[in-house]
Amino acid sequence: MSPPKGNLKARGPRADPVPVTVFSAPELLNVAEAEGMIFPPHVVDQLVAALDAGKHVILTGPPGTGKTTLAYLAAELGRHSMLCTGYQPTTATSEWTTFETIGGLQPTPEGLIFRPGLFVEAIETGKWLVIDELNRSNFDRAFGQLFTVLSGSAVVLPFRRSGQIKPISLVPHGVEAPADTDPIRLPASWRIIATMNALDKHLLFDMSYALMRRFAFIEVTTPPDWAYEKLLEGDGEIVQKLLPLRTLNNLGPAIFVDAKRYVHRRQRDDVTQSRLLYEIFYAFFLPQFEGIDEHKAVQLYKLVAKHLDPPEQAETQRVVAELLGEELVG
């Protein structure tokens, strides 16, 4: 995994080795803590158990709980446990079709050739597939024949690989390939780990029951208060002043960790504590309160303003009022 710098959701695979050989919950917890993240042990236990049991997994929970980071770390641990060759990160979109996921014909100077999609490419290379924001896809349109494959049956695709005369088939481990096909076999340990914001379940498209049955759902809950305090030791001391905001919204630790990293960099500059606190509030926390009512807006302002000097208090009152869409009273 990348070092704990930068945006958590932007991380991808890295090549340098991690001294881990056992795919277990204790190992995953240790790797997570080394990355500056603390997850409830029962969440990690569930994730490891589900993957060990042969299930694909969807991690759900509030924004900022570190779902994407946990997915990456689990896949990276899988790589160093020889369960996969690596992992392929992607973000789902509403435009996904089977062309993006399974593949399709692509024109070339030599004619039309089959271009594998994300899923087929991951299967062929032995990589686990990590999908962020899965709920943003149209599941039935995007998964297509994968429904059959994920349920343990082989499926024949209407495509042929370059130089082949037989159609491609996707064949789960332990299943006989259909006759007269060019099989692409799913490794026994191949997995999909996807994330879904609990608050976004109603957005764009509803997940069909057919797809839900093919995944284990695991809720990534927020850790206890002591975990936040531990994560914010050192440079994060100023960020601890914003921990009471959790009484207004179930803010995950990743938001606070990102704020701590910003503080670490910004403290090199000539900036007052009041200004710095306002900056991290505006940059990392204010967007999490979109859609709050007037009562919560007043509480939000008061919780932050008591730590600020008059100039930053005025700015905070203004931006909270803009978020509310009307003048802040109280």
Segments and roles (model prediction):
Residues M1-G330:
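C-terminal regulatory/interaction module of P-loop NTP-utilizing enzymes
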